[in-house]
Amino acid sequence: MIRDLFKSVIGAKAEDLRRAAIISVLAAIACAIMPAAAMAQSAVNINLGTGAGLTERVVQLVGLMTVLSLAPSIVIMTTSFVRIVVVLGLLRTAIGVQQSPPNPVLISLALFLTAIVMAPTFERSYDAGIKPLLDQQMELPEAFEAASGPVKQFMLSQVDRDDLALFVRLSKIPQPRTAAETPLRVVTPAFMISELKRAFEIGFLLFIPFLVIDLVVASVLMSMGMMMLPPASISLPFKLIFFVLVDGWRLVAGSLVESFQRGAGG
C-alpha cells in the first residue's frame, strides 16, 4: 500500500514537472519575442535626409568624427602639455628613478597643470566660438576661426620668433605682415619646437643639483676604495631626501605654471 502511494506521488510530481517545464518554455519564448517586437517598434532611426544636402551632411559627420578622434593630439599640440610632461619626465630621469612616479601619474599631473595654464584661454575660446555655435548664431567655419583665435594667440605668446620664421619659410607661404596673420598650420609646429626647446632648458637646470650629488658620492666612494659599489644606488637616497627637503614638487609645478604666465606677459 505504501509502495502504491509512493508511486502515485512520484507520478503526480513527474506530471507536474512536465507541465511546469512546458509552461517555462512557453514563457521564455514569449519573453524573447515581446522585447524584440518592442525594440522593432522603437528602433533608433538616424535620418540624414534626402536630396542634394545628404552628401554635405555625411561629410560633416565624417569630419566631426575625425576631429573627435584627433582631440587628444590637438590637446597635446596646441597647449602647455608638451613642456610640462617633458619636464616631468626629465625630472624623473635626473633623480634616477625610472619607474617612479609611473607614467600615468606624470601624465595626470601634467594634464591638471595644463588645465590650470589653459583655463583662461579655453574660456575665451568657448565664449568666442563654441557658445555662439551651440546657440546657432554662427556657422561652423566662422565658429572654428573664432574659437581657434585665443588658442593661436596663446601659442604666439610662447613661440620663438626664429622657429616661427623657420616654418614660414618651410611652408613656402607669403611672408605675413604680422605674427597674428600666420596660419594655424604654421604656428602649431613652431610652437611645439619652441616648447621642446624650453623643456630641455628647464631639464638642464634640473639635472645640475642631482649631477653634483652623483659626483660627490662617486668621489667619496673612490676615496674610500669602494670601487665595486654603484654610485647611482648610493646617491639615490640622498637625491630623494634633497628633493623632499627643498619641496621640489611644489617648486617644479609652480615654476612651470609661472613660466607660461611670464611668457604671455612678455
Swiss-Prot record:
Main localization, broad class: membrane
The UniProt keyword set, sorted, is: Bacterial flagellum, Bacterial flagellum biogenesis, Bacterial flagellum protein export, Cell membrane, Membrane, Protein transport, Transmembrane, Transmembrane helix, Transport, Virulence
Task: Look up the domain of life of the source.
Answer: Bacteria
> Which GO BP terms apply?
bacterial-type flagellum organization; protein secretion
Segments traversing the membrane: 20-40, 58-78, 102-122, 202-222, 226-246
Membrane topology per the entry is: Multi-pass membrane protein
Which InterPro entries does its entry note?
FliP (IPR005837), T3SS_IM_P (IPR005838)
Looking at the Swiss-Prot or TrEMBL record, what is one Pfam family this protein matches?
FliP
The compartments listed are: Cell membrane; Bacterial flagellum basal body
The reply to whether Protein transport figures as a keyword in the UniProt entry is yes
Can the keyword Transmembrane helix be found in this entry's annotation?
yes
Instruction: Give Gene Ontology CC terms.
Output: bacterial-type flagellum basal body; plasma membrane
- Homology family: Belongs to the FliP/MopC/SpaP family.
NCBIfam families in the record = fliP (TIGR01103), PRK12797.1 (NF009438)
Q: What does this protein do?
A: May be a component of the flagellum. It is required for normal cell division. May be implicated in the secretion of virulence factors.
* Protein name according to UniProt: Flagellar biosynthetic protein FliP
**Source taxonomy lineage?**
Bacteria, Pseudomonadati, Pseudomonadota, Alphaproteobacteria, Caulobacterales
